[in-house]
Amino acid sequence: MGTDVAFVKMHGLGNDYVYIDVFANPAPEDPAGLARRLADRHRGVGGDGMILVEPSQVAAARMRMFNADGSESEMCGNGVRCVAHLIVARGYAAAGPLTIETGRGVLAIEVMPRGPLQSQVKVDMGPPILLARDVPVEH
């Protein structure tokens, strides 16, 4: 017997993720395993992965991102834009400037709602990593 999981699926410029609102629902006990099951495009909801939207001590929200294989990643620019839309649409933060905590640090964001299902979101991603040797890779 399975466990019910409340989620929403959103996409930002082609990146599609399953989002779990941990403000309103308990965090999954095994997020990596849940990400693998939900992101499976043949037997699950399908997506690039799963993002937990959690309360934060230092920002309006915290995002934890899991790839489709269950590995945890620092962040995704399109994913964080959807997190920003979700927290404003659900009333956890006001539209306008806000911050979101990610595995890469706290990002400055501006949310401009364009209706109940859309927002224009600007994200300051910080300086780009241009050299391959500087890109974090786990072996």
Give the ranges of each region predicted by the language model.
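Catalytic phosphate-donor-binding core of small-molecule kinases
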Residues: 104-138
